[in-house]
């Protein structure tokens, strides 16, 4: 009676041993396309859109900026238009992840780290603080690639040593505003002027650079800059009122994002005290500055967008590409604002303007 039972046991153990042997020698399972597509490992600087699409997913591009105001918004619009013109359509061939720190510099660190954790193929930064945050989040991995715009000086910001000496995963276009030329318009339009009010945020490396340019340039023109520092946009109006009380005869604002984000507060004080407002961003004239001479930020966005396209297509060698300087700019005049602020604009200056706002 035991022999049949023994035979059955032997047969069962034989099948079991065969199963074990088969399992041991079977090749390791390979990830499927679907599994590979959901892997969010941060790409290196050599990642291309072709690599990402081949993995079965749309490439992700992170766009980050310090705050929303016309110049920075124009930069990002230029980038997105350049991407779209090259076939990188949001939701169709690429996923654009946009993030705005709403003027809070520490928030940029969180945004940059999230982009890295999300495995974006590329980060586009708008403003100097955004570039610094993205650089700090990517420096250990040396990627993903970064394209920067609206940066006064990547050198003073501690990102690059020279135009051809920069991190192998970081590239962009320097947007150094024509501070000296904009200041020169003040005594030209206001002969005899002596003091000009100037507000900036020292936490913005770009503003420190502009201030270091503005102070000696103003002195060379026979002007004294009355300088006030702020730390956030809510302080702009009080700072402007304090400068007006100190007897300044005009205001000048460069490309400080903290100030420009709350430009209307400065314009209010300028209008109430008949103090002409001169600016370093043409878009500021549309908001109420009397005279604005500066760079074309939409064009700068298009140009940096072209760099982003080159990276996504795997055609741009970042390490061997030099940082260029944006030189395309224009003069804008707001005649209604000038009249409100007590400034007369002669015809020869109007003739030089790319944009004249009548009312």
Where are these regions (language model features)?
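Short hydrophobic alpha-helices and adjacent helix-cap/hinge residues
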Residues: 2-7, 25-359
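Sec-dependent signal peptide recognition
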Residues: 9-17
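C-terminal motif of bacterial Sec signal peptides marking the signal peptidase cleavage site
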Residues: 20-23
């Amino acid at each position: 009676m035991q022999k049949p039972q023994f035979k059955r046991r032997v047969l069962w153990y034989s099948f079991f041993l065969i199963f074990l042997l088969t399992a041991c020698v079977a090749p390791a399972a390979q990830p499927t396309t679907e599994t590979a597509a959901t892997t969010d490992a941060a790409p290196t600087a050599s990642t291309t859109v072709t690599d990402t699409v081949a993995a079965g997913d749309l490439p992700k591009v992170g766009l980050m900026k310090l705050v929303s105001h016309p110049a920075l918004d124009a930069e990002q619009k230029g980038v997105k238009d350049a991407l779209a013109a090259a076939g990188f359509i949001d939701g169709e061939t690429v996923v654009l992840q946009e993030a705005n720190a709403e003027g809070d510099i520490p928030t940029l660190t969180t945004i940059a780290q999230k982009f890295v954790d999300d495995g974006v193929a590329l980060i586009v930064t708008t403003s100097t603080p955004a570039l610094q945050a993205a650089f700090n989040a990517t420096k250990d991995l040396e990627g993903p690639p970064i394209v920067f715009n609206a940066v006064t000086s990547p050198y003073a910001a501690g990102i690059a040593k020279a135009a051809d000496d920069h991190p192998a995963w970081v590239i962009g276009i320097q947007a150094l505003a024509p501070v000296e030329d904009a200041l020169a318009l003040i005594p030209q339009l206001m002969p005899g002027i002596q003091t000009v009010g100037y507000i900036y945020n020292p936490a913005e490396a770009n503003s420190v650079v502009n201030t270091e340019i503005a102070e000696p340039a103003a002195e060379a023109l026979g002007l004294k800059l009355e300088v006030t520092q702020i730390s956030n946009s809510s302080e702009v109006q009080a700072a402007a009122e304090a400068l007006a009380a100190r007897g300044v005869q005009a205001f000048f604002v460069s490309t400080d994002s903290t100030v420009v984000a709350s430009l209307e507060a400065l314009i209010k004080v300028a209008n109430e005290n008949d103090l002409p407002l001169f600016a370093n961003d043409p878009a500021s004239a549309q908001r109420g500055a009397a005279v604005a001479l500066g760079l074309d930020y939409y064009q700068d966005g298009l140009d940096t967008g072209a760099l982003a396209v080159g990276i996504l297509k795997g055609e741009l060698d970042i390490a061997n590409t030099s940082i260029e300087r944006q030189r395309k700019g224009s003069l804008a005049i707001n005649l209604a604002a000038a009249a409100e602020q007590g400034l007369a604009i002669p015809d020869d200056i109007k003739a030089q303007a790319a944009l004249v706002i009548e009312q």
